[in-house]
Amino acid sequence: MENKGIRKILPHRYPFLLVDRIIEIEEGKKAVGIKNVTANEPFFQGHFPDNPIMPGVLIVEALAQVAGIAVMNIEEFKGKLGLFTGIDKCRFKKVVRPGDQLVLEVLIDSIKMGLVKAKGVAKVGDEVAATAELMFIMTEEG
């Protein structure tokens, strides 16, 4: 799924759309996305000008967006909004820099009454950059 398809599902837009492409999806079960991290990312202007590092919270947000794509493709959740309710066991293991390609792998653990629990792993090559357990609720509005 290319960027145009992602924009049909997610409400996020530049500069906060953090997924460039979906390379694998099993509706309601898993999704794998790609974020090509470029030197032109707006967050690098201040984080940090002489030592650019992608903020960890944005890596987690990118994982959440991939999870949202896996869930928002389900008929009952189309057009709904996913809002974070929690992040557990989040760990940052590798610095992500301009030129890196983040592979964002998300497994959906459960969906009950609109509450989604998922596990995410962000990798650069074979190295794990971040892991997190994500929880969000599917809702009509924010």
Swiss-Prot record:
GO terms for cellular component: cytoplasm; membrane. Its EC number is 4.2.1.59. It holds the Pfam family FabA. The keyword Cytoplasm applies. Its main location: cytoplasm. It catalyses: a (3R)-hydroxyacyl-[ACP] = a (2E)-enoyl-[ACP] + H2O. InterPro entries: FabA_FabZ, FabZ, HotDog_dom_sf. GO terms for biological process: fatty acid biosynthetic process; lipid A biosynthetic process. Belongs to the thioester dehydratase family. FabZ subfamily. This is 3-hydroxyacyl-[acyl-carrier-protein] dehydratase FabZ. It comes from Thermoanaerobacter sp. (strain X514). The gene is fabZ.
